[in-house]
Amino acid sequence: MRSVEVTIDIKAPRDVVLREISEYSHPPVLHKSVIKSVQVLEDKNNVSIALWRLKVLGFTRTARQKQIVMPPDKMTNETIGGFARGTLESTFLYETGEGTKIVDRIEIRVPKWGKLLEIPIALYTRRMTEGILMEHKKDLESRYG
């Protein structure tokens, strides 16, 4: 298992940031180079399960994720099926004087046959997560910053 951590500051209120990063309708639009589609299978209270089609290392992969939103300052995404099953992303949001600080920690799990790919996948995941968070930053700061 490998872990990666990405930190970013966004000049927008914490509740708005949490709502935006946990929302399913914008990823295929805002992050279209990586996320091909999202289909929500279940959505009850702050727990949802969705089927994602993602572009990973040039290949389109499918993953089923369980998302738990814990307002006002935490969200988790666990891959429960498909590519990278067992991967856990924990997102923490902290209020700052200028907006919100996001700390995104991802514990990457790959199948035993994929151990040689663990480091490249970790590096790719870090770069992909930074890109997605930067897209959120640009979008939110254009509206709130």
Go through each PLM region and give its residues:
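Hydrophobic ligand-binding cavity/cleft-lining segments
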Residues: 1-45
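Intrinsic-disorder/low-complexity, polar/charged segments enriched in Ser/Thr/Lys/Arg/Asp/Glu/Gln
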Residues: 1-7, 47-49, 62, 74, ...
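Residue-level recognition of well-ordered beta-strand positions that form the cores
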Residues: 7-9, 51-53, 68, 78, ...
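A short, structured loop/turn motif at beta-sheet edges
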Residues: 11-15, 42-46, 68-73, 92-101
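Hydrophobic pocket/interface hotspot
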Residues: 17-21, 27, 50, 67, ...
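Short amphipathic alpha-helical signal-transduction/dimerization elements
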Residues: 25, 125, 129-145
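Glycine-rich portal/gate segments that line the openings of hydrophobic small-molecule binding cavities
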Residues: 38-84, 134-143
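Beta-strand/loop substructures that line and gate deep hydrophobic ligand-binding cavities in soluble
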Residues: 79-131
